[in-house]
Amino acid sequence: MKGRAMSVFTRHQVIEKNSILLVIGILLVIAIGGMVEIGPLFYLKSTIEKVEGMRPYTPLELAGRNIYVREGCYLCHSQMIRPLRDEVERYGHFSLAAESMYDHPFQWGSKRTGPDLARVGSKYSDEWHVTHLMDPRSIVPQSVMPGYPFLATSDLDYTSIAAHLRANRKVGVPYTDEQIEHAVDDLRAQVNPDEPKVAEFQKRYPKAAVRDFDGNPGRITEMDALVGYLQMLGTLVDFKLYDDKANLR
């Protein structure tokens, strides 16, 4: 047995000492691995799971997402729960490709100085988010997150929100002409439950929350937009109805 092992090792030395054979071997292994991993994708119509409930962002949520990107939140927070036991037990169901199919660019992140935010929606109250964004250490004394108090005093500039929807449609987000046309009205309606056009807004964006998010009625701030975006994350797919096996291929 020992002699056989030595014989295999001796034969392998021939490859190690011959650079051409070594390169050929490396390329062969890469080719096999590529066929195993990439090949099946050519037979799939889509790599996105079939789920119920996903919809494009509302104008307010899209404005909040733009602020999220602008302030670099993705540098410290991920939006990607991996299928590992510790992550699933802490954050919830692992992330689905369908949940980020309308993100351009996606917000999966690459670093977790802070917790993952993929399912932060409805986990805390609006007041909690406002307080945390204004002064993180008032909630978590050990936090290294900077404060964003200016969001509460900065009026949201939504004059070009229709153009943002139109730009997203060009990269594949299925916004309709009606949604683009009423973008400004829909943004105003989402933060004001007394707005006459709330019913029309909810028809265009099912399950969208309608309320004043920053606790400052009568004024639409950047805080409204960011909190509205955060409160939506991870809430669109009902995992009580989601069937993992239906997406097996």
Give the label of every model feature segment.
Residues 40-54, 59-63, 78, 94-107:
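Sequence context of c-type cytochrome heme-c attachment sites
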Residues 45-69, 81-84, 88, 113, ...:
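Electrostatic cytochrome c docking/interface patches
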Residues 64, 70-80, 129, 226-230:
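The canonical Cys-X-X-Cys-His
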Residues 2-57, 193-201, 229-249:
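Post-cleavage N-terminal segment of exported redox proteins
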Residues 39-46, 71-75, 80-84, 136-137, ...:
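A generic secondary-structure signal for well-formed alpha-helical elements
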Residues 2, 6-13, 86-93, 99-102:
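Long, low-complexity, intrinsically disordered N-terminal extensions of eukaryotic proteins, enriched
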Residues 22-31, 89-222:
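Electron-transfer interface patches adjacent to heme c in soluble/periplasmic c-type cytochromes
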Residues 76, 142-148, 237-246:
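Surface-exposed patches in mature extracellular/periplasmic domains of secreted proteins
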